[in-house]
């Protein structure tokens, strides 16, 4: 059974939350493209887990925060929501901007043991010397496809062919993303050094053809953790869960199985 409702987080933010499945909990966090970009992951995990998939405030036509919140506000709000519900050993998975939120949540979980596993998929959120994050806002439709996908011709979207309501959602999503992550651009200057304090093993999955944040960026991101594994997904770009879903889900399943054995 799938249920979607609006929840109010402890810091006053509201988010649309979809829940499905039963079992150990998992939180799946989308990036700038919205919840559709992680829908396949959520559906897969819901076969064996209780999966929570929020739509971040301001995405897909939902209300934007009135005041400043940023990624830190989302991370704090989601973590507190899990804690208030008594959820423990949560597998947290984040794609792109969602990976940044997930990483921020992990550094905040300093004793409650709420988070039991961490998977970052082509995440942003840190500054890596020599590996700048591509300015997504400066790209046209072709540029987005070329930087985001291994096979851009297959996935390029012509804005003229997008229905008006969906185009409005996309424009609103970009406005919200710019508001919460545009300055400093797509990173927290303090996050990289804090990752060494994360207490759970992390898996960082990266599309080999990602030109938004390159595999070299991802490898450096992984090295900042005390315990992390870095895996490259062949023939995929910034969204390997869309271009190579089978390989991406297999990597997540293998990581989760190791996590079960570790905690069992």
At which residue positions do the language-model features occur?
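Short beta-strand/loop motif that positions the catalytic acidic residue
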Residues: 198, 204-206
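Catalytic histidine-centered segment of alpha/beta-hydrolase-like enzymes
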Residues: 236-245, 249
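Hydrophobic, aromatic-rich cap/lid helix
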Residues: 2-3, 164-193
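Active-site loop/oxyanion-hole signature of alpha/beta-hydrolase fold enzymes
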Residues: 52-93, 250
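Conserved HGGG/HGGXW glycine-rich cap/lid loop of the alpha/beta-hydrolase fold
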Residues: 13-63
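Short alpha-helix in the alpha/beta-hydrolase fold that links the catalytic acid
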Residues: 41, 200, 214-223
């Amino acid at each position: 059974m799938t249920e979607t409702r609006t929840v109010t987080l402890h810091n006053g933010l509201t988010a649309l939350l979809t829940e499905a499945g039963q079992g150990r909990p998992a939180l799946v966090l989308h990036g700038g493209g919205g919840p559709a970009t992680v829908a396949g992951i959520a559906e897969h995990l819901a076969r064996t887990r209780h999966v929570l998939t929020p739509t971040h405030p301001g995405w897909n036509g939902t209300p934007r925060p009135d005041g400043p919140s940023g990624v830190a506000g989302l991370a704090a709000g989601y973590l507190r929501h899990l804690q208030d519900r008594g959820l423990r050993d949560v597998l947290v998975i984040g794609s792109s901007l969602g990976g940044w939120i997930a990483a921020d949540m992990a550094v905040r979980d300093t004793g409650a043991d709420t988070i039991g596993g961490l998977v970052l998929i082509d995440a942003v959120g840190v500054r890596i010397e020599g590996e700048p994050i591509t300015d997504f806002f400066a790209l046209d439709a072709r540029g987005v496809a070329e930087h985001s996908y291994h096979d851009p011709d297959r996935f390029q979207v012509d804005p003229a062919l997008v229905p008006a309501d969906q185009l409005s959602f996309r424009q609103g999503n970009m406005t919200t993303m710019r508001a919460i992550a545009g300055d400093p651009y797509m990173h927290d200057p303090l996050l990289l050094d804090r990752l060494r304090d994360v207490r759970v093993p992390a898996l960082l999955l990266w599309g080999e053809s990602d030109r938004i944040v390159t595999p070299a960026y991802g490898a450096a991101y992984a090295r900042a953790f005390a315990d992390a594994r870095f895996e490259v997904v062949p023939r995929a770009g910034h969204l390997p869960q869309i271009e190579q879903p089978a390989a991406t889900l297999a990597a997540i399943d293998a990581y989760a199985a190791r996590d079960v054995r570790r905690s069992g």
